[in-house]
Amino acid sequence: MTVPIAIIGTGIAGLSAAQALTSAGHQVHLFDKSRGSGGRMSSKRSDAGSLDMGAQYFTARDRRFATAVKQWQAQGHVSEWTPLLYNFHGGRLSPSPDEQVRWVGEPGMSAITRAMRGDLPVSFSCRITDVFRGEQHWNLLDAEGENHGPFSHVIIATPAPQATALLAAAPKLASVVAGVKMDPTWAVALAFETPLQTPMQGCFVQDSPLDWLARNRSKPGRDDTLDSWVLHATSQWSRQNLDASREQVIEHLHGAFAELIDCAMPAPVFSLAHRWLYARPAGSHEWGALSDADLGIYVCGDWCLSGRVEGAWLSGQEAARRLLEHLQ
């Protein structure tokens, strides 16, 4: 019997590792506490259509990742997004075009991880609470007390604070990962029946509780019945208001949006708030991935590199590369 490799987390990093390992002929089994794949790359189904509440777009600078993106494009899972960009600074809103190529999943960010997952075996709504090693193999324990295993190796592909809690069997790794701080982000979606009278489709914001806003319907393949917008608060504001109610967050960020936009703003017909507790790493690292190859445990995620989507994908590739190298 072939003993599979366990991968905890079905965001870009975990799925990138899974693809690399299955391409090399290995069996994997994925676990995720959510109901679907994607992590911060997931889209939220709502009365206002599919909303990208997490990652807004991504770029491809590394040659290997750019090749993967071109494959996704050929398969119809991603498209270029060319928004009319603005900048808000010192109380002034001004056009801010640039040459950056931006990619989005189509018809939502979830399309990418759904395609990457394919028909790989996965246990959703399964929160792993303990990772422990027997004489030969690894086993996982979930929040319901159910045991999963055996597994030959374990890859943990979650935000750093969640990974730390699963590394009791690898104290050296745990101490490194425990030092990684991640910043929160409050995200709010607002939808309007009548489109806002502004050409703006994306905006980088300074001197405000807001950090970024995007006109969701301007992305390829999105539902355009309503004029939906996604607002991201700054890490600082999000941390200061971490335990605020969703209603308070919506009210405050809606107000900040109304202050910066250059047109009248009616009352939204739909609003939604989501708190990303671990939205992005507070600093960048150059680890690629972390591992204790002798134990057979590996850790990857965007926080091992740049904190970007590309960083997550590359980190998953690196975790798989190290595992395969050790098997040789």
Swiss-Prot record:
It catalyses: 1,2-dihydro-beta-NAD + O2 + H(+) = H2O2 + NAD(+); 1,2-dihydro-beta-NADP + O2 + H(+) = H2O2 + NADP(+); 1,6-dihydro-beta-NADP + O2 + H(+) = H2O2 + NADP(+); 1,6-dihydro-beta-NAD + O2 + H(+) = H2O2 + NAD(+). Pfam families: Amino_oxidase, NAD_binding_8. Its EC number is 1.6.3.5. GO terms for molecular function: FAD binding; NAD binding; NADP binding; oxidoreductase activity, acting on NAD(P)H, oxygen as acceptor. It comes from the Bacteria. It is an enzyme of class 1 (oxidoreductase). Keywords: FAD, Flavoprotein, NAD, NADP, Nucleotide-binding, Oxidoreductase. InterPro entries: Amino_oxidase (IPR002937), Bac_renal (IPR034721), FAD/NAD-bd_sf (IPR036188). Substrate binds at Y57, F58, T59, A60, R61, S96, P97, D98, T185, R308. FAD binds at A13, D32, K33, R40, Q56, Y57, I128, D302, V309. Its cofactor is FAD. Catalyzes the oxidation of the 1,2-dihydro- and 1,6-dihydro- isomeric forms of beta-NAD(P) back to beta-NAD(P)+. Has a preference for 1,2-dihydro-beta-NAD as substrate. May serve to protect primary metabolism dehydrogenases from inhibition by the 1,2-dihydro- and 1,6-dihydro-beta-NAD(P) isomers. Belongs to the bacterial renalase family. This is Renalase. It comes from Pseudomonas savastanoi pv. phaseolicola (strain 1448A / Race 6) (Pseudomonas syringae pv. phaseolicola (strain 1448A / Race 6)).
